[in-house]
Amino acid sequence: MGVDIKELVEPVAKEVELGFFSKKVIAIDAYNSLYQFLATIRQKDGTPLLDAQGNVTSHLNGLFYRTINYIELGIKPVYVFDGRPPELKQKELERRYQIKVEAEKKYREAIERGDLEEARIYAQQTSRLTAAMVHDAKLLLRYMGVPYVEAPSEGEAQAAYMVKKGDAWASGSQDFDSLLFGSPRLVRNLAITGKRKLPRKDVYVEVKPEIVELEELLRVHGITHQQLVVIGILVGTDYAPEGARGIGVKKALKLVKELKDPEKIFRSVEWSSDVPPEKILELFLHPEVTDSYELTWKEPDKEKVIELLVERHQFSMERVTNALDRLEKAVKTHFKQQSLESWFGF
């Protein structure tokens, strides 16, 4: 779900072309991207891509081709995977499960009615990412020579930490939580850049990447990072989705400016969760992160990629080999005056 502070972010978000990120390291929220691929890469009736054994492969399809697109533009992606979810998130995970169950029911009903448009919308809400699917995604990245990081807990917190350290230029995620975790820079729409159809409408829109600078966001609204986190908590986060009763973004912004002190603010509102807001504040300000990672980009192992995608999951041999040729060509084209070592080493 993520925190909904779009109202605050919109005035400072800047659209750019994907090529703007050439030569930049982007710490991408892996789960966020994989779920987007699972939601968008589907057949007309909403069915995801499947291999001969019935295993879902939409996530691998998106990860493979989108990552090659990044590298063709000179972008240096590093994918950050979630670790153990915080205990505070348990109720939200249960809520998401129930949403998927209800969506599956509505999907089946839409299929029975022959309403493929409605079926596809509900199908997108049923996406599940299993341990086996995550394992295959990591294998694919390893074989492609693209680094990934295993966060101890929240992937967005780890990505934000890497940007703060200077190991990455920006966090890449659709969710605004990255800003609450303190990422100096957030890039949205990376995984969905291009033409996208609007739900229930025969209308296509061009989706472009957008950049949000944390410092500018805070300056424009006259708040501190801690106050931004408090606003997010009041509006609702993954740890307490309901937030404070009757509090929207505008009212939350007014409260943090008037009362300033988080304890006073939390005492002044009707809290709708049994999770103490102080604990959520602590989690955002001091998340669990690690320095145990290495950002090294290597040459792809074409045979291993073919073994995983073509032999195990029945991808088209022609499409995969053509894509791998593009990957090799992209490295030579963009960095022909550098040795592979000088580019692939951060």
UniProtKB/Swiss-Prot annotation:
Enzyme class (EC, first level): hydrolase
GO BP, sorted A to Z: DNA repair; DNA replication, removal of RNA primer
InterPro entries referenced in this protein's UniProt entry, alphabetically: 5-3_exonuclease_C_sf (IPR036279), Flap_endonuc (IPR023426), Flap_endonuc_arc (IPR019973), HhH2 (IPR008918), PIN-like_dom_sf (IPR029060), XPG-I_dom (IPR006086), XPG/Rad2 (IPR006084), XPG_CS (IPR019974)
GO molecular function: 5'-3' exonuclease activity; 5'-flap endonuclease activity; DNA binding; magnesium ion binding
Record EC number: 3.1.-.-
Keyword annotations of the record: DNA damage, DNA repair, DNA replication, Endonuclease, Exonuclease, Hydrolase, Magnesium, Metal-binding, Nuclease
Job description of the protein: Structure-specific nuclease with 5'-flap endonuclease and 5'-3' exonuclease activities involved in DNA replication and repair. During DNA replication, cleaves the 5'-overhanging flap structure that is generated by displacement synthesis when DNA polymerase encounters the 5'-end of a downstream Okazaki fragment. Binds the unpaired 3'-DNA end and kinks the DNA to facilitate 5' cleavage specificity. Cleaves one nucleotide into the double-stranded DNA from the junction in flap DNA, leaving a nick for ligation. Also involved in the base excision repair (BER) pathway.
Protein name: Flap endonuclease 1
Organism of provenance: Thermofilum pendens (strain DSM 2475 / Hrk 5)
Lineage: Archaea, Thermoproteota, Thermoprotei, Thermofilales, Thermofilaceae
